[in-house]
Amino acid sequence: MAALATSQLATSGTVLGVTDRFRRPGFQGLRPRNPADAALGMRTIGASAAPKQSRKAHRGSRRCLSVVVSATGSGMNLVFVGAEMAPWSKTGGLGDVLGGLPPAMAANGHRVMVVSPRYDQYKDAWDTSVISEIKVADEYERVRFFHCYKRGVDRVFIDHPWFLEKVRGKTKEKIYGPDAGTDYEDNQQRFSLLCQAALEAPRILNLNNNPYFSGPYGEDVVFVCNDWHTGLLACYLKSNYQSNGIYRTAKVAFCIHNISYQGRFSFDDFAQLNLPDRFKSSFDFIDGYDKPVEGRKINWMKAGILQADKVLTVSPYYAEELISGEARGCELDNIMRLTGITGIVNGMDVSEWDPTKDKFLAVNYDITTALEAKALNKEALQAEVGLPVDRKVPLVAFIGRLEEQKGPDVMIAAIPEILKEEDVQIILLGTGKKKFEKLLKSMEEKFPGKVRAVVRFNAPLAHQMMAGADLLAVTSRFEPCGLIQLQGMRYGTPCVCASTGGLVDTIVEGKTGFHMGRLSVDCNVVEPADVKKVATTLKRAVKVVGTPAYQEMVKNCMIQDLSWKGPAKNWEDVLLELGVEGSEPGIVGEEIAPLAMENVAAP
């Protein structure tokens, strides 16, 4: 598996980071408390004395969930910032990355914090009693910082009514709007608040849970920003802090998880961001769409890319796609060709997805027992969803968010073509846009003995499908990395996938799955050529099920190391290139996964 690659335009003066002309100081105007804070205008209340962070003298404590194998340095201070953080909040791959990568970095000896909104009254997060007042638009907003220490990571939650009062009950899609595809009108204010609060957290939170570190993180920090919601952080870092001699060597890495969501707003809204005018050019953007307004706009992701010191994304092939042209770079391809972009394949949570211990399976298994156990799990799955129980009938699973990116409409259009020629069963699982939910149910009504559609969130069924299905269909129009195919391989289920993004980097034709070719990125139409690709490839794969070649594919899938260990090392190598003062290589460590879910959110 290709784990790390760099895509870069071969032109004079272009490097992976951002050239010095984009690294500009600025001004800031938040409410001052004392002369020291006046430079920031940030008011902090209730924080205990915050000495410089130090490494604790004893390394023998077993309070953290990692084992040190050999030490090679003192590591880095890493602060990940994102709108999602699994399992507390998640709508897709962004939440999974911020849930899984930080513990792997901590296991390698780095001090790691993740900052995300407090969308719910999480049972395991405690009020630090630290309060800050932050200027957003024309008003000062008071935020509190909640904290828990899990799997070697400081999890920090920003508490404010803009987050907590909008998201009642289970978070799901309500992080960004009341319904799938609908945004809250104040998302700019919400995520401006997140960015500014995240910059305060390492300086003012006196955290002492880690057996190896104590006190605040200090100012020698690498901020790892994720997607458009954090696009302002580098701007605020330069204008509010570095121009005043604070965070002098701190750097920002900006990771793109999905280029299709960019944070485009009216150009007039720039004035509400409280940034110097010299940042305007980084936000300035014109496209051919009339939403949210026609004509000139600001683009948060564009600014995040230009103002960052390093730009990354979640797979090497997706990095190549992003700079290939407007269609797949979503009109930011020219910007990324300027800055350069590095792709690192994601890992997955191998403790949550483990066929040897999975409590949802009828029969647990490993690579030595997979073939018989998968047949038994198939029979249990067929019975569970109401399909005829027959282990000899090939079973195809489709699991995904029901939105254009995942191509549920393409999959649905291909089903009649598949069933005309093949004796096969298909189970469809997903929630999302109502039009796609109706499409799924229509297939079940049309083919009652062959198709089952489950249009609700059902985690146990997802696990059962991974174990019981013969093939996993992934019909994404684009897929930055993809998690579903990693989960499938973990359970010995070959993937039949579109040839895009991380699917290219992780699925090997004839070894761990089947490639159907690249599908059109036009989300407004279902191309007949794409339907043919899906149907033809699935029919080809179905014919392989049950053969010695298929049995070999099952084994090939299960021998893969899909954990975060390898990606974490690649991330370390890239972040060390930033040269933040005091940063050193970490240690060679191994995280010990918790035996049970530690972090349970209140419903």
From Swiss-Prot:
The keyword Chloroplast applies. It catalyses: an NDP-alpha-D-glucose + [(1->4)-alpha-D-glucosyl](n) = [(1->4)-alpha-D-glucosyl](n+1) + a ribonucleoside 5'-diphosphate + H(+). It is an enzyme of class 2 (transferase). One of its GO terms (cellular component) is chloroplast. It comes from the Eukaryota. Pathway: Glycan biosynthesis; starch biosynthesis. One of its GO terms (molecular function) is alpha-1,4-glucan glucosyltransferase (UDP-glucose donor) activity. Changing residue 45 to V: In strain: cv. Iyatoma Mochi, cv. Mochimugi-D, cv. Shikoku Hadaka 84, cv. Waxy Oderbrucker and cv. SB 85750. Its EC number is 2.4.1.242. InterPro entries: Glyco_trans_1, GS/SS, Starch_synth_cat_dom. The keyword Transit peptide applies. It is found in: Plastid, Chloroplast; Plastid, Amyloplast. ADP-alpha-D-glucose binds at residue 90. Belongs to the glycosyltransferase 1 family. Bacterial/plant glycogen synthase subfamily. This is Granule-bound starch synthase 1, chloroplastic/amyloplastic. It comes from Hordeum vulgare. The gene is WAXY.
